């Protein structure tokens, strides 16, 4: 059990905004550390400094920030969002050395190229990829790997939630997408100083959430993803279905995912992996050392009675460790998309959705006549819907009714 009354949260943003209340309920005083003077653009609305008695800002000197934080006598630090993972690692190694994730593999838990390299070194199967800012080098690599003219994925080495992830179709112009990503500022507020080119993986994608204590990994939840593409944008979230721990799909994924967690040096805390089950077996898309975002904590708790936030507080404050999870009810989450940007004209299209037998919850993210962005990633969804029911056919029937509503959405040109 923890002795210090303070809990330091690095970037309590996105899902991490749920940490302050959870730690307060457990008797802790949450302390916020922001990895910059302002939160990254994608997380601005989730920054609530009033949730904290103490807020500290990182201005570039890790050692100086660590000295500021020593007054709290920290026994651990937790990252709240992707943007805080690296700083949290650095502060942990200074303030409570040897208690965090493997420091030498810190970049492998954040940079997708380093991630794949860590898998290669550990002998874990991975997708072929290259990180470069030089299109000539990229072309040489594509030729050497017999990938020129094949379907490819192009994305920033450091991004999240499907931001700037593009597919290049067979014999497509990969250079155009390469140039589109290189040099841009992504939604984490980082400049893309290189581009990641990856072989395209076909199969079924899964989210595998875990929690680790002293290097022993346990499952928190597992979901099957359904994602869609629009033009050359792929990985647009459309639907998730929660699976039971004893499901054969889960049993096929979990041994591989544990190898991934070991390879990138996750020794304690949350793991959030996206894994594609291909014809050649499971392959990592990416893994993160922080809680799942995008409203996932709510749906995880509904489906399993637990989530990353609760698991973290139970371990850090009370010393409780849980092995595995129980699926307590069947849940399907739906991400409603805007097919174009413009004026959202018919919010009433969702009238009557509450009468669906499996309806549980819905959040429409924009008002009538508001200008909405085209949905291209998790940040730009138009609405979220949660369906819960014991009968699979009822879930399917109601799901298709929601799709009919989505198809009837009217968005006028701006």
List the predicted regions and their residue ranges.
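A conserved helix-loop-beta module that forms one wall/lid of the active-site cleft
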Residues: 94-164
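Short, flexible turn/loop "capping" segments at secondary-structure junctions
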Residues: 156-159, 233, 375-380
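ATP-dependent carboxylate/phosphate-activation module, predominantly the ATP-grasp catalytic core
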Residues: 172, 179-180, 199-266, 270, ...
């Amino acid at each position: 059990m923890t002795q210090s009354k303070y809990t330091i949260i690095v970037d309590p943003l996105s899902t991490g905004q749920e940490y302050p209340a959870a730690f307060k309920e457990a008797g802790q005083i949450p302390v916020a550390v922001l990895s910059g003077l302002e939160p990254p653009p994608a997380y601005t609305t989730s920054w609530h400094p009033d949730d904290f008695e103490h807020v500290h800002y990182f201005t570039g000197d890790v050692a100086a920030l660590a000295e500021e934080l020593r007054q709290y006598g920290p026994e651990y630090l937790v990252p709240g969002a992707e943007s805080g993972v690296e700083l949290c690692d650095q502060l942990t190694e200074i303030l409570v050395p040897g208690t965090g994730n493997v420091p030498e593999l810190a970049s492998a838990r954040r940079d997708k190229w380093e991630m794949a390299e860590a898998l290669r070194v550990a002998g874990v199967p991975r997708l072929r990829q290259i990180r470069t800012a030089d299109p000539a080098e990229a072309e040489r690599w594509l030729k050497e790997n017999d990938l020129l003219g094949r379907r490819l994925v192009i994305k920033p080495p450091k991004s999240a939630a499907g931001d700037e992830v593009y597919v290049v179709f067979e014999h497509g112009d990969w250079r155009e997408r390469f140039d589109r990503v290189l040099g841009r500022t992504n939604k984490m507020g980082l400049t893309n100083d290189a581009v990641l080119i990856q072989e395209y993986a076909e199969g079924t994608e899964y989210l595998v959430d875990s929690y680790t204590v002293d290097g022993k990994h346990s499952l928190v939840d597992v979901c099957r993803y359904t994602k869609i593409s629009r033009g050359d944008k792929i990985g647009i979230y459309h639907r998730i279905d929660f699976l039971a721990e004893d499901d054969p799909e889960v049993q096929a994924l979990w041994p591989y995912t544990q190898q991934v967690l070991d390879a990138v040096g996750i020794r304690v805390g949350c793991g959030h992996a996206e894994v594609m089950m291909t014809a050649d077996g499971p392959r990592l898309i990416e893994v993160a050392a922080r809680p799942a975002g995008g409203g996932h904590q709510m749906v995880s708790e509904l489906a399993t009675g637990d989530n990353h936030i609760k698991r973290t507080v139970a371990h850090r404050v009370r010393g409780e460790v849980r092995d595995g999870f129980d699926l307590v009810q069947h849940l399907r989450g739906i991400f409603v998309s805007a097919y174009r940007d413009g004026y959202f004209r018919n919010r009433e299209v969702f009238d009557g959705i509450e009468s669906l037998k499996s309806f549980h919850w819905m959040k429409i993210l924009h008002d009538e006549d508001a200008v909405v962005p085209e949905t291209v990633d998790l940040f730009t969804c138009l609405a979220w819907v949660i369906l819960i029911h014991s009968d699979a056919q009822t879930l399917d029937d109601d799901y298709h009714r929601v799709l009919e509503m989505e198809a009837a959405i009217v968005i006028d040109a701006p």
